[in-house]
Design a protein with these regions (language model features):
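Active-site flanking residues adjacent to catalytic metal/cofactor-binding acidic residues
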Residues: 47
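The −1 position to Zn-ligating cysteines in a subset of zinc-ribbon hairpins
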Residues: 1, 5, 225, 281
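Flexible mid-to-C-terminal extensions adjoining Fe-S/redox cofactors in radical SAM and related proteins
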Residues: 12, 238-299
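N-terminal pre-triad scaffold of radical SAM enzymes
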Residues: 1-12, 39-44, 231-235, 239
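Radical SAM/AdoMet-radical enzyme domain recognition
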Residues: 27-43, 52-155
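Canonical Radical SAM [4Fe-4S] cluster-binding loop centered on the CxxxCxxC motif
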Residues: 1-25, 244-245
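Radical SAM enzyme [4Fe-4S]-AdoMet core and its adjacent flexible, acidic
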Residues: 101-232, 237-238, 242, 251-254
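Short, cysteine/histidine-rich loop/knuckle motifs that typically chelate Zn2+
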Residues: 8, 228, 284
Length: 299
């Protein structure tokens, strides 16, 4: 469920047909992961995650279950100023990182900036992704520059149609692509806050420019060994637990094709979970999701 309807996002994220997980099922999954993975990174994606009425309660209860958990909440930052003040006052700075994304076609830039300011001032670890929709280039860049006075990480991001693995949306000029690469090479990756959260991508122990890799289509790890499924898990809208975002299925009302079932690790609604015991060989052509990319892998 989402309150935006961005043209580049899949329709199922904002068509209103899929709601939120049951509170107890979500907590069950945190408990299961915490049994043998005490240092846990838990990413919450949408739709718009902060529309979940149980969000603040869930975060606080998850921290009670596992004091070492780090929860990343992905949000478009569009809730009211009062909502974000209430969230900031929950005092979970050690355990929560906030990953904002600015979508210029729908989001009020002043509201977005004010909400960034609120959580950053409260000491939360905050990153802001400025989604570069070509018709809004100037609007996006202006707000990105405006946030440079805030203690946050800020970067301009490429957009892919419907989360395609390697294509970019139409409308990018070479000047825009060069600007994205250049701004992702600066020092804006330094993110302040109490939570331990490193989202830089490394290759052979050297940091790389991930946006540049995607533009140049150098983001393939096919046939590499990967810890997805043993250390990294992705839960789709229908509760299916899978190794990563590329090995998931949203088709057919959540019923996977026969060939997809081999990558099914369980379902949180059925309270069934069977992680892999070792690395898998990557079967996909491209790995566009940054969180999938930072998952340990080798050739």
């Amino acid at each position: 469920m989402c309150n935006f309807a961005c043209a580049y996002c899949p329709e199922y994220l904002h068509d209103g047909k899929v709601g939120f997980p049951k509170y107890d099922d979500a907590l069950w999954f945190v408990k299961e992961l915490s049994k043998d993975k005490p240092d846990l990174f838990f990413e919450i994606l949408g739709g718009e995650t902060t529309l979940w009425p149980k969000m603040i309660s869930f975060v606080n209860e998850a921290v009670n279950i596992n004091d070492n958990i780090v929860i990343e909440i992905n949000t478009n930052g569009s809730r009211t100023r009062n909502w974000w003040k209430r969230f900031a006052e929950s005092n979970v700075q050690k355990n929560v990182v906030l990953n904002f994304s600015y979508h210029a076609a729908f989001c009020d830039p002043d509201l977005y900036y004010d909400n960034l300011f609120t959580v950053a001032e409260a000491g939360y670890t905050v990153a802001s992704n400025f989604m570069l929709d070509p018709p809004y280039f100037d609007k996006v860049v202006d707000l990105w520059k405006r946030t440079h006075n805030l203690p946050i990480g800020a970067s301009i991001k490429l957009l892919r149609p419907g989360f395609d693995s390697h294509k970019l949306i139409d409308g990018y000029t070479q000047e825009m692509l060069d600007y994205i690469v250049k701004t992702n090479m600066d020092d804006r990756h330094a993110i302040e806050g109490d939570a331990n959260w490193d989202i830089n991508v490394f290759a052979d122990e050297e940091p790389i420019n991930w946006q540049e890799r995607v533009i140049e289509k150098k983001h393939s790890f096919k046939f590499w060994y990967c810890s997805a499924g043993s250390k990294r898990f992705h839960v789709n809208l229908f509760g299916d637990i899978r190794p990563c975002s590329q090995l998931t299925s949203y088709i057919n009302d959540g019923i996977p094709h026969e060939e997809d079932k081999r990558y099914l690790l369980g379902n949180i609604f059925k309270r069934d979970f069977r992680p892999y015991e070792d690395l898998i060989v990557c079967p996909v052509d491209y790995c566009p999701c940054k969180i999938d990319a930072i998952c340990y892998k080798h050739d």
